[in-house]
């Protein structure tokens, strides 16, 4: 396993966080309309992945549906077909799959994928989302990079897709913001101890902390 350099396209272009969303215009974060808008503007795109109940990577930030839809409860208790019928609040869009997002982007702009922590504790990963992501990216023609707050996910992706650049999403890990994560664990992750172990090539850090 080797460290893979981040393509220049990720540094030349602005990267739209959760795509180019604008709620007043009906473009909700991580939605097809937000993805199309970012591509049209020539901007790179960052999206988040959660796993459906039937093992499909879904482009959605939260682990629960409540904030962005009229539904409630965990994303991972619904199938991809069920999630694909749930409308995003304030939009005509529904929750897209990774495959649908890739088809919209079609290699025209760089894509940064954050794999959301499925353990919810920054603990070991069962590897299901990582495996589904690697499979979904197989054969995709375009610049892609992967990242996660959870170093276990980054390490897993390094084994499954060693050809793709990977990074660690980091934070100040204020215990008040990361409860119930214990303070010693916050201090551990604050030091970014897994950067070299995962052969990461970049860090994505929360802007307010810089």
Give each language-model segment a name.
Residues 1-210:
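Phosphate-group recognition and catalysis centered on beta-loop-alpha active-site segments
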């Amino acid at each position: 396993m080797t460290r893979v350099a981040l393509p220049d396209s990720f540094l030349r272009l602005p990267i739209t966080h959760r795509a180019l969303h604008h709620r007043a215009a009906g473009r909700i974060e991580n939605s097809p309309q937000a993805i199309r808008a970012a591509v049209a503007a020539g901007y790179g795109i960052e999206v988040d992945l959660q796993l459906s109940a039937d093992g499909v990577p879904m482009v959605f930030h939260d682990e629960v549906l409540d904030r962005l839809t009229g539904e409630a409860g965990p994303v991972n208790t619904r199938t991809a077909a069920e999630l694909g019928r749930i409308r995003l609040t304030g939009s005509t869009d529904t929750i897209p799959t990774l495959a649908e997002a890739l088809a919209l982007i079609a290699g025209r702009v760089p894509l940064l994928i954050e794999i959301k922590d499925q353990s919810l504790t920054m603990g070991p990963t069962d590897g299901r989302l990582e495996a589904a992501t690697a499979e979904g990216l197989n054969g995709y023609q375009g610049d892609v990079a992967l990242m996660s707050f959870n170093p276990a996910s980054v390490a897993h992706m390094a084994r499954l897709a060693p050809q793709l650049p990977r990074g660690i999403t980091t934070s100040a890990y204020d215990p008040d913001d990361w409860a119930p994560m214990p303070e010693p664990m916050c201090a551990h992750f604050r030091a970014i101890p897994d950067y070299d172990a995962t052969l990461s090539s970049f860090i994505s850090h929360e802007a307010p902390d810089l």
